Amino acid sequence: MIGLVGKKVGMTRIFTEDGVSIPVTVIEVEANRVTQVKDLANDGYRAVQVTTGAKKANRVTKPEAGHFAKAGVEAGRGLWEFRLAEGEEYTVGQSISVELFADVKKVDVTGTSKGKGFAGTVKRWNFRTQDATHGNSLSHRVPGSIGQNQTPGKVFKGKKMAGQMGNERVTVQSLDVVRVDAERNLLLVKGGVPGATGCDLIVKPAVKA
């Protein structure tokens, strides 16, 4: 089963009939329009390419305009691709709504996390700080040693150090689907998802469900 592209609206909470408060993220999933269908013969794999939303005409490049015109769909804010499983069939120009998730219990949500800029090891990796006093006058939030000795004589790849924090592709898995509102094109999932309000999200049926 393919996924859909949506937009993060924000967080709120809803109440069950028993009065239990559930924190939810509201995802607006406008109709995903099929712009291209890839097959084994021409592309070597089966996939469907979709767009959603709208883009100003003066922001659409000529190659993009031709691509959307060939598919007979309105120019969207981007292009996304989903692999097709055996038996799944879609046609160019077809519109896919949030009702795709009507019978789905859990989803995986992928987005770009909020950028935090250049961060030290305490903020970025939750390192412990060193002594505030007792002879320590300069090294309160420094990471400490980053290596060993003449052997190996280098800093290992992947060593946790200061650097850019956030602004990376993140997937949160197995979030409960609380509600599917087809009339307003809304999908409510339990808990938080990556990214700032208004960012694009890719929602897929959970792989671990």
UniProtKB/Swiss-Prot annotation:
Post-translational modification: Methylated by PrmB.
A GO term for molecular function: rRNA binding
The keyword Isomerase appears for this protein: no
GO terms (BP aspect): translation
InterPro entries: Ribosomal_uL3, Ribosomal_uL3_bac/org-type, Ribosomal_uL3_CS, Transl_B-barrel_sf
Swiss-Prot/TrEMBL keywords: Methylation, Ribonucleoprotein, Ribosomal protein, RNA-binding, rRNA-binding
Name assigned to this protein: Large ribosomal subunit protein uL3
Gene3D superfamilies, per the entry: 3.30.160.810, Translation factors
Modified residues (N5-methylglutamine): Q150
Entry GO CC: cytosolic large ribosomal subunit
Disulfide bonds: none
Function: One of the primary rRNA binding proteins, it binds directly near the 3'-end of the 23S rRNA, where it nucleates assembly of the 50S subunit.
HAMAP family xref list: Ribosomal_uL3_B (MF_01325_B)
Subunit-level organization: Part of the 50S ribosomal subunit. Forms a cluster with proteins L14 and L19.
Gene name of the encoded protein: rplC
Family: Belongs to the universal ribosomal protein uL3 family.
